[in-house]
Amino acid sequence: MKNILLGILAFVAVFLVSCTNSKAENTQITNAHFKTGDIVPHYQVCMVNNAYMGKKQLEVKHDGKTYYGCCENCKLRIPQEENARMAYDPISHQLIDKATAIIAISDKNDNVVYFENKANYEAFFNNK
């Protein structure tokens, strides 16, 4: 009986370790192809945290537009808080809608910045 119990515990331990390794590898592969300055898809950005997440986020519809958040709390905040839906373009200093903005990774920590057009995006990253 003792040997059977030890065998089961060993199997469970191997299974848990293999699941952990697989998730870590998947995360690295997903984020590997975007770097600072790259334009990223809206659906991979948490618009509440202003962060590139590397995978599809939760879709939130508001006033006929689509926003994205990473959790249930973000889904609640997007319709209620204007700063979850709007951002300032760093070049024009105009308030723009995140749902229609060009979104790019701004630093090595996967924070994002929003632009009202491609010309502003190019001006921002050419001056860095």
Annotate each language-model stretch with its function.
Residues 1-7:
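Positively charged n-region of N-terminal signal peptides that target proteins for export
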Residues 46, 89-92:
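Short cysteine-rich clusters marking metal-coordination/redox-active sites
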Residues 73-87, 119-128:
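Short metal-binding segments enriched for Cys and/or His
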Residues 15-18:
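C-terminal motif of bacterial Sec signal peptides marking the signal peptidase cleavage site
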Residues 24, 53-54, 97:
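Short functional micro-motifs and their immediate structural scaffolds
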Residues 24-33, 69-77:
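Short Cys/His-rich Zn2+-coordinating modules
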Residues 20-22:
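Bacterial signal peptide processing site
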Residues 35-73:
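Post-signal-peptide N-terminal segment of Sec-exported extracytoplasmic proteins
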